[in-house]
């Protein structure tokens, strides 16, 4: 397999992981903005487990704590507290520090209900299977290199939302988060962060006519196929 195809497959896998993160982890499991068909939810969960290693309950807890203390003391990764570059480059450290605190995870996810995959004892190590899949596709060393690129870019794109999209960009609402359409294109809409902080339970992140939330058409398609149900949207006047 030539390097171009390896790069294409790696970047496609990256974007699939990004879409799974925003649709399953963020909008569905963390904020309850939509419901997913159990099979669809399980597939998105499996993709994330294999190719990111994220444990959904930990992710939801850290993110809910971020909203609770947004850009105030207690925020797990505020660039106003730690600095933009520190969060951009060190967001994974801040995330792991919080995610490893079991008391914090329980506190911020009292409503959590494990799905079938959560209950499997080996799911914490599923990312090793994902790495093996890359190696089977591309060979050991090229596969390891492609997997590393995928993981680093995934972490960096998530970090960019938590850092850049709190300090750089425009605001529709009076909160410290910002909107950046360029980052929204790369993160399936997550870069519309000012909108999200105003209406955190909304299944749609775009509110103005010029804003594009790439994950929203996918959610609408799933809903049209009876595989998802949107539960929350922003107030009509906010989306004007």
Task: Give each language-model segment a name.
Residues 1-160, 164, 202-240:
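Non-catalytic, topology-defining segments of multipass membrane proteins
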Residues 108-115, 172-192, 196-199:
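Active-site-proximal inter-transmembrane loops
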